[in-house]
Amino acid sequence: GIGAVCAYLEERYAEAVSLDQLGGIAGLSKYHLLRSFTKQKGISPYRYLETIRIARARKLLEQNVPQIEVALQTGFADQSHFSRFFKRLIGVTPRQYADIFGGRQA
């Protein structure tokens, strides 16, 4: 069911995932998966995946992992896409976030 889909996404957040794959895990068609998931979680499976990726990215940035590494480890195609998406969701750039929350010395 939907719980299995969530577990799959949490474990494989860095991989490319399709609705067909997720439907297979849940035993539902793409359409029914999308409806059921959104009804239960309040967000789409893709938004859920993005949320997991950004949460992981925040942890890595706090550990001073370079942005390009963070982007690649969290499933983004490149640093540019990661930076734009991070800023849109969090409100600051990854660099600003790392400066604020990372373990850097001033």
Predicted regions mapped to residue ranges:
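Short hydrophobic/aromatic patch on the recognition helix
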Residues: 32-33, 37, 81-82, 86
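Conserved phosphate-binding and hydrolysis motifs of nucleotide-dependent enzymes
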Residues: 42, 75, 86-87, 91-94
